[in-house]
Amino acid sequence: MGGAMEAGAVERITIVGAGLVGASIALALRRAQPGCRIVAVDPDPAVREALVPGIADEATDDLAAGLRDAQLVFVACPVGAMPAVLEAVARLAPADCLVTDCGSTKASVAVAAAEAFGVDSPRFVAGHPIAGSEGSGPAAARADLFDGRIWLLCPAGPAQEKAAARLAELLSRLGARVESIHPAAHDAMFAEFSHWPHAVAFALCAA
């Protein structure tokens, strides 16, 4: 990586997928770094209309245009779309741009990222902000959505660990508590969590 992700130097940020999480990232960035330029990429015209003004400086459905001159990219699209989106972002984004995702599963994203960017590429760090809301879409977005919430980064190797350290500085300014975990360990942990509601329900029925 070049100097694009040095602390305080990120001025041009692109968010791919501007639902609740993507739009909240934009608002948190505006709060933390008022001078940065935020471009949102989303295929839904209603979403794009809701973003400008106020949330993003520009909203487009053209990925190539949205990635032009970006220093940092947040990919906040559905996990199922991640392989195709990461492949396109890897091809179209500037070579010194850092890319991270916001998906809830990480092992499959790590595989897709390795195919798109290369194994342990310093251009990509998998991520998972543990934050949500009852609402959805940009109308429910909040600048404080990540305040005090854990944001997991999942570097897959030494090069990504260095990139993750730089990214963590920015995420901390968004209010998040940043922790690192291996992609496979992340998925194993959340798979275990997913069993808990079923176990509780079973126990209640058996009581």
Protein language model annotation of sequence segments:
Residues 63-93, 97-100:
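Rossmann-like NAD(P)-binding element
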Residues 5, 64, 91, 116, ...:
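Short secondary-structure boundary/capping segments
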Residues 12, 37, 123, 150, ...:
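Residues at the starts of beta-strands that form the adenosine-phosphate
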Residues 145-207:
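Internal alpha-helical scaffold of NAD(P)-dependent oxidoreductase catalytic cores
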Residues 45-47, 81, 106-109:
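Conserved short alpha-helix immediately C-terminal to the canonical SAM/SAH-binding motif I
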Residues 85-139:
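Rossmann-like NAD(P)(H) cofactor-binding subdomain of soluble oxidoreductases
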